[in-house]
């Protein structure tokens, strides 16, 4: 239905939250009786999705303020759509992209990125408070003028650190044209400088969630060896499930 969804990556090739770790708990010197702790799902106002790969597991939250993308993603996860699909396009210091249904059992020689799920594109849901910081979960798209999203392909940002001067240049050269009323907040500037991202995509592609655990997995996948076309030499398969 949609052609060349991976336009996102072809454009950026020219241009080119935080991991949660459990504190180490000291064991008591003596234990009289083992106790069994009940496992409780994380409490969150947003829906949480677990993304499992050979390089580790990520947990992402889906923003309630982007309900069209949130609900579509949940539907696909719950149906098993993403299971056994690949992160088929990987660019270090940029992003890892997946969700093309054609990537399941795809031969190594196949160019991926043009596939879609049944149904229409998802209308754009740009929000000023959602931006392409490291760990951002966003929707890929083709070059349609409405900037509507692919109904299945997504990417997770690795990016790189951006200082204030660089961010101002990016804003003036592109982001401002995407949305003249948008301005970076002080907090957003600090985040780009501290953890990085891909600011040149802001207000141009819909960000609908973010990785809140397993951010190191993004770095591991983004660092794999790739072939021409940015497909990993060794397939990076995914499996997803909703946590709440």
Ranges and model annotations:
Residues 1-23:
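Bacterial Sec-dependent N-terminal signal peptides
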Residues 20-244:
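Cyclophilin-like peptidyl-prolyl cis-trans isomerases
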